[in-house]
Amino acid sequence: MSVLKRYDLEKLAVATVASHTALQILRGAKKYGFRTIAIAGRADVAEFYQQFNFIDEVWTVDFRNFVKAAEKLVEANAVFIPHGSYVEYVGWRQALEAPVPTLGCRELIKWEADQYKKMELLQRGGIPTSRVYKTPEEVDRPVIVKLFGAKGGRGYFLARDREELRRRLAGLSDYIIQEYVFGVPAYYHYFSSPVYGRVEVFGADIRYESNVDGRTFGWVEPTFVVVGNLPLVLRESLLPTIWKYGVQFAKAVEEVVGCRLAGPYCLESIIRDDMSISVFEFSGRIVAGTNIYMGYGSPYSVLYFDRPMDMGERIAHEIREAARRGRLEDLFT
């Protein structure tokens, strides 16, 4: 990326939107000696982030004109770390236009905004997925309906049969109908490292969702709004398969999307009682589930580095090593 060639590598700054995983990202960046910038969309949000001494600057900007803020980030010698709030609040169009060097495959942000393209990419990678129905007439079992975008489960709903599905789809647009797979949820955290030439299984979590995980006693319809995350240590016999799916996904991104995957990403799945895995979604950037081991380090990071490391630190470590080796352009698009 030509912008990086003009940067002073001794004065790199790391920036991200003040939400989602910003605390983890910026804490890790500061630990590795980078200047840090949090970008808030509201004054009250900015006030919260200003209290942390590992954040050097907090900007308040209008996300509707993020490209202008990105130009200032270039002037500040900053690289940008995308996450779910960036995808949702700024949007893929501005994400593609923003001139600031962005970690990972920038084009993947556009794919992430379309549920059908997400499933296509998983399938192209040879990863087992839940069945997708194009119309209610095809439905012959319970399904879950998901809205497009990184909405943290908001608006998702279950339908037990096609009649219920038709009724609840009235007035909706931009959604996908998926088979509801029975089992337990598991969300796998990966890191694709151009510096070390490998895909790392970094951790896993379970989402804590309102109100499906609450005390509803059957009185209300289940909803799936993510309010937090719970830690998960996977059965070791599952790890080879989970790692393989992560590798296959990284290869699919490079072959289908046309850019190399670099940095954190996530495959979201159900594990059945026969230990088979059905992947129903991906996130092509850091996920909020990595916050469960912020400051402590993930259970698998010690396997790669012989010391605990959280995902924010892992990102900063990769940036530092790439800068030392003259390979920042392998990380940023």
Swiss-Prot record:
Binding site for Mg(2+): E268, E281
Cofactor note: Binds 1 Mg(2+) or Mn(2+) ion per subunit.
Named cofactor requirement(s): Mg(2+); Mn(2+)
Superkingdom: Archaea
Residues involved in ATP binding: 136-187, 209
Pathway(s) served: Purine metabolism; IMP biosynthesis via de novo pathway; 5-formamido-1-(5-phospho-D-ribosyl)imidazole-4-carboxamide from 5-amino-1-(5-phospho-D-ribosyl)imidazole-4-carboxamide (formate route): step 1/1
List of residues binding 5-amino-1-(5-phospho-beta-D-ribosyl)imidazole-4-carboxamide: H20, S85, N229
Catalytic activity reported: 5-amino-1-(5-phospho-beta-D-ribosyl)imidazole-4-carboxamide + formate + ATP = 5-formamido-1-(5-phospho-D-ribosyl)imidazole-4-carboxamide + ADP + phosphate
Gene Ontology biological process terms from the UniProt entry: 'de novo' IMP biosynthetic process
PROSITE patterns attached to this UniProt entry: ATP_GRASP (PS50975)
Pfam families to which the protein is assigned, alphabetical: DUF1246, DUF1297
ATP-grasp domain ranges (all copies): 106-313
First-tier enzyme category under EC: ligase
Intrachain disulfide bonds: none
GO molecular function: ATP binding; ligase activity, forming carbon-nitrogen bonds; magnesium ion binding
Keyword Cell cycle set for record: no
Biological function: Catalyzes the ATP- and formate-dependent formylation of 5-aminoimidazole-4-carboxamide-1-beta-d-ribofuranosyl 5'-monophosphate (AICAR) to 5-formaminoimidazole-4-carboxamide-1-beta-d-ribofuranosyl 5'-monophosphate (FAICAR) in the absence of folates.
PANTHER family the record matches: 5-FORMAMINOIMIDAZOLE-4-CARBOXAMIDE-1-(BETA)-D-RIBOFURANOSYL 5'-MONOPHOSPHATE SYNTHETASE, 5-FORMAMINOIMIDAZOLE-4-CARBOXAMIDE-1-(BETA)-D-RIBOFURANOSYL 5'-MONOPHOSPHATE SYNTHETASE-RELATED
Family: Belongs to the phosphohexose mutase family.
Protein name: 5-formaminoimidazole-4-carboxamide-1-(beta)-D-ribofuranosyl 5'-monophosphate synthetase
Organism: Pyrobaculum islandicum (strain DSM 4184 / JCM 9189 / GEO3)
Upper classification of the organism: Archaea, Thermoproteota, Thermoprotei, Thermoproteales, Thermoproteaceae
Gene: purP
